[in-house]
Amino acid sequence: MNILVVYKKNFEEVHDGGLMSLKGILQRVAAKEHHVDYKPREHVRRADFIARDLVIVFGGDGTLTSLSHNIDPATPVMGVNSHPRTSDPHGSYGFYMDSCIDTFEDDVNTVFAGEAIVNELPRLQALIETTSGNRFTTDPAMNDLLIANTHQYAPSKYHLRRGENQASQQSSGLLFSTWFGQGAWLRNAMSHDEFGALMQRTTTVRTDQHYFVLARDLSPEQRAEAPWAWMDWTDEETTITSDMHRGYVVPDGWDEVHFNRGATITCLLYTSPSPRD
């Protein structure tokens, strides 16, 4: 196997000690049959992920989500929590990090044996088409994706289409979320009752192509006029035509991708594998 280990570098003792343990384990169990490279998160580039059979991410959820933007859908990713809450209440929750130093040796041997469970994790991506006809995509988001006015104090204006439905809206931006990313932002962007009502829709149907969408700070009148355009659980593409002087798409709170008035932005899902023991 051609393996890349990417690690969080913050000079804290718990992370440095864990990294030394991880390296020791890999030297012992992978030295003969596998090639292993190590890179700190700050120095890694997209080219570093090319032709890898496995990417091991050592850190927390934020480390994994930021790196996932550089990883293609066919590359398996293994998350190792460098500071789990089981040993420290101030540690990382590690929703995506199924392994830790205590279990890493058994977990990685399971991967080497081809016996790991592979989860297909959906990721959100936006396709932007400019008024001049140029088309480009944003980095994929594991948790959520925001489409909004670059000036957050100004309203986000756009024409919204999903399936046969259409609506013109003025909101604080559209927040899209994967099923697994609902706890990152979506759940905190609405009231408890609103979130409960939205979750009721997921009980009837749930596929790998479904995602959440919420129009933030939408007026009561607009909510009543087009409930589907306020909050939804859908497997249909959502397309907006911007009526903002300048807007942006932000995947996972990371890089900003800007667009101008008249651009069309389509949000869609695709899946990527993640091995779990």
Which residues does each PLM region occupy?
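ATP/NTP phosphate-donor binding region
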Residues: 1-58, 70, 90-117, 135-139
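Gly/Ser/Thr-rich active-site loops/lids in small-molecule metabolic enzymes
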Residues: 168-219
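A conserved acidic, glycine/proline-rich C-terminal tail/linker
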Residues: 225-261
